[in-house]
Structure formats: structure tokens, C-alpha cells
Amino acid sequence: MDNQHRKIAGYRELTQDDIDLMNRVKAVGAELLALQAALAGRLSTDLEVKQAAAKASKLAPEHESSPECVELRRFLAAEPLRWAAIAKTDIQTGVMALVRAIAQPEGC
């Protein structure tokens, strides 16, 4: 693109190597975000399966200690969906930080 090397206020002029590196960072970031989304989807499915199994195992209130209920409590205590969401934010932050390291804006 012709406008790739135009000066943006507050930023230095980027070389083609800078632009190529920035594009690599963005591509790897997109790949990581796709992996995170796949994991979050799998975890959501796991939660639904574990909830259904726990519900099916409780024929009476005293069955709260069934292996399925114990597994659901373990899963919920580990907070995997929360950690997957944190990972998404951290990936986005990391990509932004790498791009900023390449662009080297003035000020701020």
C-alpha cells in the first residue's frame, strides 16, 4: 500500500521490516486468539456435560457426594472459563504491547 510509510502524528516512520514484523505479530496474535476461542468453547461444553451428569446423578439430596457432583465442584473451583477469559485479555494486551514496541510512539 502506498500509505504504509506515511507519517502518523506521534509515531516514527516505519520501515518495511517494521511493517513486516508488525504483521507477523498480528498474525500470531490472531492464531493465539483462535486457540483461546477453541479452548473456551471446549470448556463451555465440558461445563454443560458435567452439569448434566451431576444433575442426573442426584436422585435424592443425599446424592450430592456422587462422583459426578464432586467432579462438577472441582471443575467450578478451578475456574477454567475465567482463566480462559483472562488469557484472551492477556493475549490482546501482549499483541498491543509488541506492536507498540515496534511502532515506538512518542510521549505517553
Swiss-Prot record:
Q: So what does this one do?
A: Antagonizes CBASS (cyclic oligonucleotide-based antiphage signaling system). Binds and sequesters host-produced 3',3'-cyclic GMP-AMP (cGAMP) (thus preventing host CapV activation) without degrading the cyclic nucleotide. Probably binds some other cyclic dinucleotides as well.
State the species of origin.
Answer: Pseudomonas phage JBD67
Explain what the UniProt record notes about the effect of disrupting the gene for this protein.
Phage becomes sensitive to CBASS type II-2 system; phage titer decreases over 10(5)-fold.
InterPro entries hit by this protein: Acb2/Tad1_hairpin
Q: Which UniProt keywords are listed?
A: Nucleotide-binding
Q: What is the name listed in the Swiss-Prot or TrEMBL entry for this protein? A: Anti-CBASS protein 2
Describe how expression is induced or repressed.
Probably not expressed during lysogeny maintenance, is probably induced during lysogeny induction.
User: Does this UniProt record's set of keywords contain NADP?
Assistant: no
